[in-house]
Swiss-Prot record:
EC number(s) recorded for this UniProt protein: 2.7.2.8
Family recorded in the similarity comment: Belongs to the acetylglutamate kinase family. ArgB subfamily.
Name by which UniProt lists this protein: Acetylglutamate kinase
Enzyme class: transferase
HAMAP family listed in its UniProt record: ArgB
Main localization of the protein described in the UniProt heading: cytoplasm
Pathway stated in the Swiss-Prot or TrEMBL entry: Amino-acid biosynthesis; L-arginine biosynthesis; N(2)-acetyl-L-ornithine from L-glutamate: step 2/4
One GO MF term attached to the UniProt entry: ATP binding
Keyword hit for Amino-acid biosynthesis: yes
UniProt source species: Prochlorococcus marinus (strain SARG / CCMP1375 / SS120)
Binding sites annotated in the UniProt record for substrate: G82, G83, R104, N197
Length: 304
């Protein structure tokens, strides 16, 4: 286990009002203790994306949260997207983007940019950020060691958009066992050697199932799943798997939230204990969701 200094730094940097006394911090630590004990030695798969990737202050908060999870004995595994950065480079190179059902239509020119950005830039920035705050991260993509076998999405009309055919968890098990934090980008190859862009939420769900994760956590730009999209106070804090399917059928969950909800459903159906959709725009959202009684987002479970 890494130095406990990370745990102290993480708690000290929680978003408490200036001047709050030591009793508040003791209360925070006391509330966190049973969760720290519960998740020691458990795998927590985190899909890192949205505004938490683009704002420097949020980036550091996420990296510290991840380091703290590792410091207290949990085993985080990070899956990342990179949509804003991909959009930036596509615009810069005058390549048009098209989305359908929350997925980016990917031709060969777009795929070149996706690979460059996700594997060459974003992945290494995340690894460096986690390493900088005292943990030890290792960057991978689905191609490495045949970690993820891809196949075309649907009927192939999405271009080089893929889905997960198989996960070879043996590639990352030694890293996890030795205290490293795998950081995985969602580019993978088919058995024919064709590279595909896979939705990072989907990859996170399949990785979580393959490694027997306790939790799957998706960092998003929403507060969670809302009963009414126009009412931020209509957050659903806890929901059963069967009720989640009903929300999709009734199109209460739609658009870009659909692949997130579906990946949570698939992960739970394959044995993951809980899935969480939380607001990555809130500093230290991970700690607030994992180590507090109330949490801050939507938790999906197989049963009550």
């Amino acid at each position: 286990m890494k130095s406990n200094n990370l745990a102290t730094e993480g708690i000290n940097s929680l978003p408490l009002d200036h001047g709050e006394n030591d009793a508040i911090r003791v209360s925070v630590l006391s509330e966190a203790l049973p969760y720290i004990q519960k998740f020691a030695g458990r795998r927590i798969v985190i899909k890192y994306g949205g505004s938490a990737m683009s704002k420097e202050s949020l980036k550091e908060a996420v990296f510290r949260d991840i380091a703290l999870l590792s410091s207290v004995g949990a085993q985080p595994v990070i899956i990342h997207g990179g949509g804003p950065e991909i959009n930036h480079w596509l615009t810069k190179l005058e390549i048009k983007s098209e989305f359908r059902d929350g997925l980016r239509i990917t031709d060969s020119n777009t795929m070149d940019i996706v690979e460059m950005v996700l594997i060459g830039r974003v992945n290494k920035q995340i690894v460096n950020g986690i390493n900088k705050v005292g943990a030890s991260a290792v960057g991978l993509c689905g191609i490495d060691g045949k970690l993820i076998e891809a196949r075309p999405w649907g009927d192939g009309s999405y271009g080089l958009v893929g889905e997960v055919a198989r996960v070879n968890a043996d590639v990352i098990e030694p890293l996890i066992a030795n205290g490293y934090i795998p950081v995985i980008s969602s580019v993978a190859s088919s058995v024919e050697g064709i590279n595909y862009n896979i939705n990072a939420d989907t990859v996170a769900g399949e990785i979580a199932a393959a490694i027997g994760a306790e939790k799957l956590i998706l960092l998003t730009d929403t507060s969670g799943i809302l009963k009414n999209k126009s009412d931020p106070l209509s957050l659903i804090q806890n929901i059963r798997l069967s009720d989640m399917r009903e929300l999709i059928d009734k199109e209460v969950v739609n658009g870009g939230m659909t692949p997130k909800a579906e990946c949570c459903i698939r992960a739970l159906a394959q044995g993951v204990n809980a899935a969480h959709i939380i607001d990555g725009r809130i500093p230290h959202a991970l700690l607030l969701e994992v180590f507090t009684d109330k949490g801050i987002g939507t938790m999906i479970v197989s049963r009550s």
